[in-house]
Amino acid sequence: MERTLIAPGVHLSCDPASKFNRCRISIHFAFPAQRKTATAHALLPLVMERGYADCPDMTRLTKKLAKLYGADLTVDARPMGCNHNLCVSVTGIKDAFALEGEALTAEYTKIALGAAFHPYLVDGCFDPQAVSIEKQMLKKGLEDEINDKRIYCLHQANREFFGDSPAGVRQEGYLEEVDGLTPAMLTDVYRQMLRTANIELLVLGCDAAQTAAIRDALLAELARIDRAPLPLVENMAMPAIAPVHKTETY
């Protein structure tokens, strides 16, 4: 896979993957994890996945994806060491398999860029109704974590081991902070992400011309943003300490 720098803090990785019948366009936003914004960043992908400016609700978005032969849009977040990684990804069949010769890759590009750079806003902020719904979903996920003892123990061990260091930030969010999140707060962390994140554009299953068109479309979006990418935090090693045994009861 070829990886090239296409703008400050922006890389393109591509592979034509000619043996497969599907393609994928993924936009990764990577930035240092911070304790004060961890819960907002955990909620952000849940709200972004519900739709964007041209498809402001899940019904319209589902219909649009269905017309593209069952394409799939996902917006998720995952830890990346001491950094946070939010990914917007669209997957679907290649143009060559479209029954009527539709330019599917161009449509996938519009959806990916729409979800990443043109969210559905109400009075300049994320839709309050969508934020309220996804706050409940995030709360439920955090409350249910304790019922999965293996995952809970892994997360707790990670928090105890790394403590207050950047690697110890609970990137899935903090239950006690969810209720306090507002659409304005979520919009602020979203805009900060656009300004400061390192961006990885991953294009799989597209030819050179399609890849160039996707690259140019992304660069056009970034040209409208006053970008100042932050350096990512390197993986860290904690000092050796004596073993500690922790017991929790409920």
Regions found by a protein language model. Give the residues of each.
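Acidic/histidine-enriched alpha-helical segments
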Residues: 62, 118-142, 229-239
